[in-house]
């Protein structure tokens, strides 16, 4: 299983209402036909030490393998998902690929 982790930094302006109300449903709708198995979204509320958290949202997308993820993001649907980021986030999220 391939886990794609997308992090949104705390110090970058983000419209979380749009993210949860529009972007997350769009990702699930558009990428499920391209191999998206599931998605987890975590709103970060703090750290164990009380220090400010470096991220406000961490999202993990699960695909069977990295080939499916690459194909999904290269599709028209994947490009639409990436383009939509500008509608709610003033920066570029960090995207990491992991294996479970």
Where are these regions (language model features)?
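Macromolecular interaction modules
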Residues: 1-100
């Amino acid at each position: 299983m391939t886990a794609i982790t997308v992090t949104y930094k705390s110090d970058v302006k983000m419209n979380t209402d749009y993210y949860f109300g529009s972007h997350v449903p769009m990702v699930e709708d558009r990428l499920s036909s391209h191999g998206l198995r599931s998605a987890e979204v975590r709103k970060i509320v703090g750290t164990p030490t009380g220090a400010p958290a470096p991220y406000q949202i961490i999202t993990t997308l699960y695909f069977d393998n990295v080939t499916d993820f690459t194909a999904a993001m290269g599709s028209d649907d994947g490009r639409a998902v990436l383009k939509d980021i500008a509608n709610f986030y003033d920066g570029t999220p960090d995207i990491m690929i992991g294996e479970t």
